[in-house]
Swiss-Prot record:
This is Ribulose bisphosphate carboxylase large chain. The basic functional RuBisCO is composed of a large chain homodimer in a 'head-to-tail' conformation. In form I RuBisCO this homodimer is arranged in a barrel-like tetramer with the small subunits forming a tetrameric 'cap' on each end of the 'barrel'. The modification N6,N6,N6-trimethyllysine is found at residue 5. Mg(2+) binds at residues 192, 194-195.
Length: 394
């Protein structure tokens, strides 16, 4: 049949199927493809589908031992990007059976593992994923979600306020705790470890945990409110990370924190499971995200990393500020903020949402506006993010 001769063959013979009707259980991906000169877009799109599923560069006899039609990724639609020359959006459908249940790690290994170094492509960006209910239901999702968090904190109808303790590196644990107390006593709901505060020589993690817990309880007693400090549990090994989370639980604090991209999705999912089992909230920082999402034509858009985090598990995630940036960015940011919080999000290309996403009652994640914001930004922030958000100053 076509496409099964010996030698190097065109991917589009097998993997470009414009007549394909997507299934409700398929994982759908939208890639922004920039082919090398002379490579037709159909071939580039099919190459992406092939390399991220069952394809290899030639036909091998073991292909006959399985059903390619059942397991292959399919490029089912290609459209040029308006206003860009030689850029196309390639839509790829992956059969559900290609992925291990409950593993964001495996999902990314399959979809973006190999294909980004591909010779036929000058650049490639994963713009969006549609996660079908059949797959999202194999994930626990956020440890608690927005509603449970508000119940735990007894704080309703407003954004939560936080700040990061500065200078982020160099304070002793005792002085760090002092700063935490002053901030919480002054009226903030949360204070935060900086993402690079782990366990350095000038402040070991256990000392910090103890002094922060003391600050927390003192501020709680004096204000009559529930307070939190995001204790950064990120560590060099997953076991050490869980050890720190256990310590936080034993101290009775409400929330811990993790750098999910540098720590990795496997570690993050383990921590999220621990947090749900033990009543800890989980604050997620996105350190390293710009390495992956900053280039417009290559990498992975943050909305995909945000969806992955909602599946892997986290109660808060940093999601940019919008303030003072371009207007277009505002709509795109609001698009993935909705993907984090809402249950059902309609396809809306103007906001960068390529697929309708149904989370089938998976708990939501609070977006955190953080980085370079101050009190003059408050009106804009409340208008943009609404009540269900964390405004993180400092």
């Amino acid at each position: 049949s076509v496409g099964f001769k010996a030698g190097v063959k065109d991917y589009r013979l097998t993997y470009y199927t414009p007549e394909y009707e997507t299934l409700a259980t398929d994982i759908l991906a939208a890639f922004r493809v920039t082919p090398q000169p002379g490579v037709p877009p159909e071939e580039a799109g099919a190459a992406v589908a092939a390399e991220s599923s069952t394809g290899t560069w030639t036909t091998v006899w073991t292909d006959g031992l399985t059903s390619l039609d059942r397991y292959k990724g399919r490029c089912y639609h290609i459209e040029p990007v308006a206003g860009e020359e030689n850029q196309y959006i390639a839509y790829v459908a992956y059969p559900l059976d290609l992925f291990e249940e409950g593993s964001v790690t495996n999902m990314f290994t399959s979809i973006v593992g190999n294909v980004f170094g591909f010779k036929a492509l000058r650049a490639l960006r994963l713009e969006d994923l549609r996660i079908p209910p059949a797959y999202s239901k194999t994930f626990q999702g956020p440890p608690h979600g927005i509603q449970v968090e508000r119940d735990k904190l007894n704080k309703y109808g407003r954004p939560l306020l936080g700040c990061t303790i500065k200078p982020k590196l160099g304070l002793s644990a005792k002085n760090y705790g002092r700063a935490v107390y002053e901030c919480l006593r002054g009226g903030l709901d949360f204070t935060k470890d900086d993402e690079n505060v782990n366990s350095q020589p000038f402040m070991r993690w256990r000392d910090r945990f103890l002094f922060c817990a003391e600050a927390l309880y003192k501020a709680q007693a004096e204000t009559g409110e529930i307070k939190g400090h995001y204790l950064n549990a990120t560590a060099g090994t997953s076991e050490e990370m869980i050890k720190r989370a256990v310590c936080a639980r034993e101290l009775g604090v409400p929330i811990v924190m993790h750098d999910y991209l540098t720590g990795g999705f496997t570690a993050n999912t383990s921590l999220a499971h621990y947090c749900r089992d033990n009543g800890l909230l989980l604050h997620i920082h996105r350190a390293m995200h710009a390495v992956i999402d900053r280039q417009r034509n290559h990498g992975i858009h943050f909305r995909v990393l945000a969806k992955a985090l909602r599946m892997s598990g986290g109660d808060h995630i940093h999601s940019g500020t919008v303030v003072g940036k371009l207007e277009g960015e505002r709509d795109v940011t609001l698009g993935f903020v909705d993907l984090l919080r809402d249950d059902f999000i309609e396809k809306d290309r103007s906001r960068g949402i390529y697929f309708t996403q149904d989370w089938v009652s998976m708990p939501g994640v609070l977006p955190v506006a953080s980085g370079g914001i101050h009190v003059w930004h408050m009106p804009a922030l409340t208008e943009i993010f609404g009540d269900d958000s964390v405004l993180q100053f400092g």
